[in-house]
Swiss-Prot record:
Belongs to the diaminopimelate epimerase family. Keywords: Amino-acid biosynthesis, Cytoplasm, Isomerase, Lysine biosynthesis. The lineage of its organism: Bacteria, Pseudomonadati, Pseudomonadota, Alphaproteobacteria, Hyphomicrobiales. It comes from the Bacteria. This is Diaminopimelate epimerase. The active site is at residues 78, 230. Pathway: Amino-acid biosynthesis; L-lysine biosynthesis via DAP pathway; DL-2,6-diaminopimelate from LL-2,6-diaminopimelate: step 1/1. One of its GO terms (cellular component) is cytosol. One of its GO terms (molecular function) is diaminopimelate epimerase activity. Pfam families: DAP_epimerase. Its EC number is 5.1.1.7.
């Protein structure tokens, strides 16, 4: 029987971004890609990101965190999911303990989370990575504020010249004049995600700047597809816009699921503030893993 059978999980969302939180502290088991896909295939535990808690391995941290996409691949960052993990660790009667701050160790580095209210949290996502080899890109670009990349006819591209940023995972942000909802991101997104310029694939965003403190965003999420919200993409969009002087260093980013406040501080850290919501709790059925061995 899978070590995940009968494990309790929390189904949550951050602005409609579907999150499952699974606590594996106290057990050595590492979720395998086929197990993540099996959990995602069940309507009760369907997720955009699976957030798995492990015992801390770094002094001064509260937990280690592994993040899975629906296709079983791992991600270095998920801002909306990190807020949900913070709620689980601070508010859930089974997992939780009273505190105002948490520090989590993810594949991308340390994530510091601060409580704003019972449901809202601020996540310090750390500094953005802006060099071409940090994002990473497949070839050198000395200026990543805009790179040579387009989709559509060469003389009339649908999207072109994105800014590229890593927030622990690679992002390409295309700035447009029209409402981002008018672009067929379900068709364009997977083509750009897998473009050879992105050796680790990329999250693809279409962004419209509506003022110096307001960005409207739609996101095709690497390994997950269209999503109602993506916290790391919102952070990347603010950084990309500020580098082009389209906005200041603080803005409200409006996604289909709602608003996030993104602040790129003078200390170079990007902080994201937004809500969480618990939808239900459940246990993983053993039958989910019958074909996942």
């Amino acid at each position: 029987m899978s070590p995940l059978a009968h494990r309790r999980f929390l189904k949550m969302n951050g602005l409609g971004n579907e999150i499952v939180v699974l606590d594996l502290r106290g057990t050595p088991h590492i979720v395998q890609p086929q197990e993540a896909r099996a959990i995602a295939a069940d309507p009760r535990s369907r997720f955009d990101q699976l957030m798995v808690l492990h015992d801390p391995v770094t002094a001064g941290t509260d937990a280690a965190l592994r993040i899975y996409n629906t296709d079983g691949s791992e991600s270095g960052a998920c801002g909306n999911g990190t807020r949900c993990v913070a709620w689980a660790m601070l508010e859930d009667p089974v997992m939780g303990r009273p505190a105002e701050r948490l520090t989590l160790q993810s594949r991308a580095g340390l994530l510091a989370v601060t409580r704003v209210s019972a449901t809202d949290f601020t996540v310090d996502m750390g500094p953005p990575r802006l060099r071409w080899d940090e994002i990473p890109l497949a070839e050198p670009f000395p200026d990543t504020r805009r790179i040579e990349l387009q989709i559509g006819p060469i003389d009339d591209p649908i999207l072109h010249s994105p800014g590229v940023v890593s927030m622990g995972n690679p992002h390409a942000v295309f700035f447009v004049d029209r409402d981002p909802a008018s672009y067929d991101l379900a068709r364009i997104g997977p083509l750009l995600e897998a473009h050879p310029i992105f050796p680790e694939r990329a999250n693809i965003s279409v962004a419209q700047v509506r003022g110096p403190e307001h960005i409207v965003l739609r996101v095709w999420e690497r390994g997950a597809g269209l999503t109602r919200a993506c916290g790391s993409a919102a952070c990347a969009a603010l950084v990309a816009a500020a580098r082009l002087r389209l906005t200041g260093r603080r803005a409200v980013v409006t996604l289909p699921g709602g608003d996030l406040v993104i602040d790129w501080g003078e200390d170079d850290h990007v902080r994201m503030t937004g809500p969480t919501e618990l939808e239900w709790e459940g246990t993983l059925a053993p039958s989910l893993f019958a074909g996942a061995a």
